[in-house]
From Swiss-Prot:
Organism of provenance: Methylibium petroleiphilum (strain ATCC BAA-1232 / LMG 22953 / PM1)
Keywords, comma-separated and alphabetical: Gluconeogenesis, Glycolysis, Isomerase
InterPro entries registered for this protein in UniProt: His_Pase_superF_clade-1, His_PPase_superfam, PG/BPGM_mutase_AS, Phosphogly_mut1
NCBIfam families reported in the protein's UniProt record: pgm_1 (TIGR01258), PRK14115.1 (NF010713)
PANTHER family, per database record: PHOSPHOGLYCERATE MUTASE
An example Gene Ontology molecular-function term: phosphoglycerate mutase activity
Catalytic residues of the enzyme: 9, 87
This protein's name: 2,3-bisphosphoglycerate-dependent phosphoglycerate mutase
Sequence positions that bind substrate: 8-15, 21-22, 60, 87-90, 98, 114-115, 183-184
GO aspect biological process, one term: glycolytic process
Lineage, opening ranks: Bacteria, Pseudomonadati, Pseudomonadota, Betaproteobacteria, Burkholderiales
Amino acid sequence: MTQLVLIRHGESTWNLENRFTGWTDVELTPTGVAQAQQAGRLLKQAGIDFDTVYTSVLKRAIWTAWHCLDGMDRTWLPVIKDWRLNERHYGGLQGLNKADMAKQFGDEQVLLWRRSYDVPPPPLEANDPRSERSDVRYAKLAANQVPLTECLKDTVARVLPLWYGTLAPAIAAGQRLVIVAHGNSIRALVKHLNNISDADIVGVNIPNGIPLVYDLDANLKPTSKYYLGGADAAAQAASVSALQADG
């Protein structure tokens, strides 16, 4: 049996401001830093250790990984950054306030954009200053790999090749991994690991900064999963996350 740990980044400034974030590179709040440090302490107290950390190329996840490792006294561990662990791209909603969008388009439409499996928000124009297509960190990617919008289905489609090509082989070889990423890239992994249907994944929320531990068998199938710090605390945090703009 081996373990895999998934952690959503700590609270970001745009989580706090209820703005859709997506691929926009925003900071952690002081609360987010504290959540990341507490995640590290919880892992250390549970006796869970790692060989390698995987994270996205967005600093709210990178800094969460660093603060978590600091809390574990494991700052020397390698941290591998991969764009495929980025948050779902929110297209034309990025940077906008969820409540304002609900007033403009209606609660039902905004909920469809946020929570449906296969309906993306309106795309950005390629020349929109919010587009990441000129961002140097994505310079080696083909233009069509840098999205202008995504639904969760699209996020799953980019996360699963990373799982099959890199993460799963590393785990099968005995590597102990922690993945520090985002609400929707983690939902993509959870959907795959637990074989959750397209309909049921809509109701799954991932709390900020609380380690989700999977026990995996030799075939990398889950035998159990649990949140450190208790299920009640995780459920309460997830309910708060569900009310915030995604990202």
